[in-house]
Structures are given as C-alpha cells and as structure tokens.
Regions:
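Flexible, active-site-adjacent loop/turn segments at secondary-structure boundaries
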Residues: 2, 145, 253-254
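Bacterial lipoprotein signal-peptidase II cleavage site
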Residues: 18-37
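Short, glycine-/small- and polar/acidic-enriched structural segments
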Residues: 35-41, 45-190, 203-213, 229-230
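Pocket-lining segment of extracytoplasmic ligand-binding domains
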Residues: 113-114, 122, 196-280
C-alpha cells in the first residue's frame, strides 16, 4: 500500500464530509460530531416537530466504532433523546453494507475505508456525517516482550480482525512502510470478530494479535501475560502525513436531503451520547 492511498482515503472522506456539511470532532476512544456545530440547528423545540416520526434506523459494528452510540438507547428511555432510535449491532461490515444500499438502514457506523469505498461506488450516495473513531488499534503480545517495533513482526503469525476493512489496510500499510512484505514476510490470520481473536490467543503460546480497544483492555483483564507491544497510531504517525481515521458514521444522501432536521437532531444526540461514553 502506497502513502498515496492514505492521502486519497483522507481526501475521499473530506469530500464526503464537505458534501454533507457535517464536519465533526473526535477522540481516540470513540467520538462524534461536536454538539456546538449542530446544537443551534436542532434545539429541543425543533426536535418535537421533526420531518418524520419514524425511528432512525442505524447500525454499528461490535467494537469501538459503535461505543459513541450506545447511550442513545438509554437517552431514549429517559426521554432525553430527540427521536426514537432503532440501533442494530453486527459482527462484520459486510452484513451492514447491503442493508444500507437497499435503504433498509438510514445511517451506519462503519470502518473509514469502507465509507470511502461506498462514497465512490454510490457517487456520493453514501456520505460521512461524523468521525467516530481515531487510533484504537494495538499489537498485543502474549507471554513475551519480543515485539518492540514493527520490524520485529517479520516471520511471525499475526491474528487480526477486519479483513477488507481498516485494520487490514492499516496493518499492511505499516508493515510495508517498515520493509516487511505483508504477503511473504508474515502470516496474517483473520477472524470475523475480536472475541474470536482473543479466544484464539488464549489457546496459542506466544500469540501476537492486532486488536482494537476496548478488547485490548478486556483481554488483558482475563490474561495477565498479555501486553501492549505497539500502538499502531504511533507507528502510523511515524510514516504517514495524514491522521489515522478508523471509523466514521455515514448516512444515505437521499435520507439526509429528505430529513436534514433529523440528521441535525441526531448529531446533537450523538454528541451527548459520546460525552456520556467518555465520562463512564
């Protein structure tokens, strides 16, 4: 993977953000659009007269890209949300894409590279409204301290999730930038979900894996022989001139054009949900 790829990805995301008019701020844990950017567009009074009374159908992946969404449901139960939400969680991005394309979802929290691909394939029909996740990927080593740099991964087997999505592209890019051929110099075993990776690590001596938070912390609590060997955000910053964006929230353009007030109200709720997640 060339450095140009990362630049094009960032450009595609920037274009989609600009096209939808929803610039956003974010944090490494999980972040969404700043409430300051949208609060004036969706006050509580406006939320009572939204252009649709249907629940906003939104999907997310199990993991960091959806952490900022989880408090929407409790907000809805408490009467603090601007609308009703139908939030569905999936184990893999390829489960979400067809639902989004067929109009069975209104929004989704997905890997950044997938968002860029969908933006291009749909000619802007799928657009980003918020960056929800920055750098949350780590190399974790079990029972040793042999991995001190990307170069130390040469010749090793690496367990990972996210084949065809951000984790794969980030890992391959970083390996290549450090002189390691990801197809010849390492063996990468992909699993559908992070929980499958942690289960495999438990049964493998000297295992090495790429995991996102919060799974890194959860795995460490279950096995005290695990250690964080590398922060892939730090490794990215050493070789790339773009920020590492791993997840974004997207909306169907048709839905955004028909219900701009709903999108604005969602972003306000989203910001509150993220704030609660970061506080918890």
């Amino acid at each position: 993977m060339k450095k140009l790829t990362s630049v094009l990805l960032a450009l595609a995301l920037a274009l989609s953000l600009a096209a939808c008019g929803g610039a956003a701020s974010s944090s490494t844990a999980s972040s969404a659009a700043s409430g300051e950017a949208v609060s004036e567009a969706a006050s509580s009074e406006e939320a009572k007269e939204l252009s649709t009374t249907d629940a906003l159908r939104i999907a997310g992946l199990k993991g960091p890209t959806t952490m900022g969404l989880v408090n929407l449901l409790s907000m809805e139960e408490d009467g603090a949300a601007s609308m009703d939400y139908d939030l569905q969680l999936y184990g893999a991005a390829d489960e979400i894409v067809p639902l989004l394309m067929k109009g069975e979802l209104d929004m989704a929290a997905i890997p950044a590279n997938l968002a860029a691909t969908l933006y291009q394939k749909t000619e802007g029909g799928i657009q980003a409204v918020a960056v929800n996740t920055l750098g949350v990927l780590y190399v974790v080593e079990k029972g040793g301290d042999t991995v001190q740099s990307m170069a130390d991964l040469a010749g090793r087997t690496i367990l990972s999730t996210g084949k065809g999505t951000t984790p794969e592209y980030v890992l391959r890019y970083l390996l290549a930038q450090n002189g390691i051929d990801p197809d010849k110099d390492v063996t990468i075993e992909y699993y559908s979900e992070a929980t499958e990776v942690t289960a495999q690590m438990a049964n493998t001596e000297d295992a090495i894996a790429v995991l996102p938070q919060p799974y890194v912390t959860a795995a460490g609590l279950q096995d005290d022989t695990l250690r964080v060997a590398l922060d892939l955000t730090e490794e990215w910053n050493k070789v790339a001139d773009t920020q590492l964006i791993t997840g974004v929230t997207v909306v169907r353009k048709e839905y955004a054009e028909e219900h701009p007030d709903v999108v604005a109200a969602f972003l306000t709720d989203y910001a509150k949900s993220v704030e609660a997640a970061n506080t918890d």
